[in-house]
Amino acid sequence: MMQRRRSMRRMLPGSTAHFDLCHSSSTPRQMSSRFSFDRAYYERHYRDPRTRVGGLGSVQRLGDFVAAYLRYLGQPVRTVIDFGCGLGHWSPVLQQLFPRARYTGVEVSEYLCARYGWERGSVIDWTAARPADLVICHGVLQYLDSRQAHRAIGNLARNCRGALFLEALTKEDWEQNCDRERTDGNVYLRPVAWYRRQLRPLFTPAGGGVFLRPDSPAVLYELETCR
């Protein structure tokens, strides 16, 4: 998750082909070898009101938008997979918005799985028995190198039969849009164009971080897409 600046500047399209790892020049082979998603990480970025990037209130507003948009588009939500579910902020929000939907939280952090009972797994290769109507991947992909992120996007598509909500910190966001004092910058920063290239063969961009699979029943008019 990232904290937006109070006064947002317009995002400019990315044109560079490289990516950066903020504050470090190392390139890990595995996410766990570079990043530690332990208790201290979640205390700083999610629990401490002085340093956290967001809380249940911000997820509630985001969930209200996603739910309203999917209802407008005609995309039913009966099953949800939340990759990188963290403290589980999406769970009560979705329970309120889609009370009959079945929620599955997937998390790579051993600490959080032990505490909250999430499914232990990675967005790179965890696979559900059946694809879900809604897949959430909120602030996860920037912790993966480009090869891992490419695999993860393919895995998101395999686990999704309807809509994907995706948020990832991009190079342009770090330079122009986010509050650097709260946003975790120790991540892989890739230009937004890189993500769009990976997503284009698999999803139709619907705006607002929502992407639709080809087999979604939702109907988009051409000006509603963000091609």
Predicted regions: what is each one?
Residues M1-R10, S15:
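Low-acidity, Ser/Thr- and Arg-rich intrinsically disordered low-complexity segments
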Residues P13, F19-R130, L144-R227:
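Class I (Rossmann-like) S-adenosyl-L-methionine-dependent methyltransferase catalytic domain
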Residues D133:
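Conserved active-site beta-strand-loop modules that form the wall/rim of enzyme catalytic pockets
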Residues I136:
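A conserved beta-strand element that flanks and buttresses the S-adenosyl-L-methionine
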Residues V140:
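Hydrophobic adenine-recognition pocket in adenosine-nucleotide-binding enzymes
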